[in-house]
Amino acid sequence: MLSEIDQKLLKIAYEEAKEGFEEGGCPIGSVLARDGKIIAQGRNQRVQKGDPIAHGEMDALRKAGRQKTYRDTVLYTSLSPCMMCSGTIVQFGITKVVIGENKSFGGNDEFIISRGVEVLIANDKNCIQLMSQFIKEKPELWLEDIAEDE
């Protein structure tokens, strides 16, 4: 069960995802927070910037800049993180990740859990609907984003 703060910050990650979708990109948004306060927020900008590493989580972390520590932060993401973003979560010692949905893409949740990260999966209907719409409307872009051929 998500706390009120978790729900609020996940909604902001969803809004970032929605904005990315409206820009013609992949609808994945993220928020990095400490003590319920936003440090930074971002969205997948692979298409917009032509940068294969510009995932939503990476965009938020870049915008956060250097932090003394990430061990007291929470990462909110509209979609389950890929292996690159999961590795970054572990590398920086982020202790909690709140995931909007892991139906469209998953598999790395267990990896970050095995590394001591608390993971909450919301199965948020808005996140699920947005990803479903994106995958239906732009299947080739989705396959490119997850590095699959078909």
Model-derived segments and spans:
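Short, thiol/selenol-centered motifs that function as redox-active sites or metal-ligating centers
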Residues: 75-89
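Short, flexible loop/turn motifs enriched in small residues
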Residues: 23-27
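Small-residue (primarily alanine) positions within well-ordered alpha-helices
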Residues: 13, 17-20, 30, 56, ...
